[in-house]
Amino acid sequence: KFDADSMNECDWMQIDEFKRKVLALQQDGVKFISLTEAYDKIANDKFRNHKYVVFTFDDGNASLKEILPWLEEQKIPTTLFINGKYLDGKSYRKNPKEKYLTYEELFAMTSPLVEIGSHGWEHIRATEQSEKEFEESVKMNIAVLEKHPRYIPYHAYTYGCHNERYDEILNIQNLVPVLIEGNKN
């Protein structure tokens, strides 16, 4: 997130600082690739002799509108994991100051450098939901997101919380599970 009104001070960054870090990675010879390209490289053992970075942004925070044009100028692919409930422009999580992309804003993002994946209907840990609730959350979110021309069948678990049964639910929905490590993006 690129907004000081974010839920907590640990999950946002000033845009200028982010740009400096990205440019430093470029100077270091890092190649930026899409999540789908990374998945293909992992599946086919093609990661040899290169440094790669994949940018993913969870939730659909409205501050993405401030950085996505710059990432596109730099030809850097990005994956957005979206919570569909917040696309209505009026539903917010715990912080009413925190704004989210609207349905119209998300569906205007059609650059080939942007991929759109699922993050659940609401920002709730899978393991805090019953299996039925989790499955319904995923289905509701996919019903909205699969209409997007840049939709990819990937689901990022909220805070990386999951278990084998939830992985099976995603598999039945033909979704690739995406995890974070150590609650760090």
What kind of feature is each model-predicted range?
Residues 172-182:
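Catalytic-core region of carbohydrate-active enzymes that cleave or remodel glycosidic bonds
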Residues 17, 24, 70-73, 108, ...:
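Alpha-helical scaffold elements within enzyme catalytic domains, especially in hydrolases
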Residues 1-10, 50-53, 61-63, 72-164, ...:
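Metal-dependent polysaccharide deacetylase catalytic core of the NodB/CE4 family, i.e.
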Residues 34-36, 62-68:
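Extended catalytic core of nucleotide-activated donor transferases of GT-like folds
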Residues 1-53:
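N-terminal pre-catalytic segment of deacetylase/amide-hydrolase enzymes
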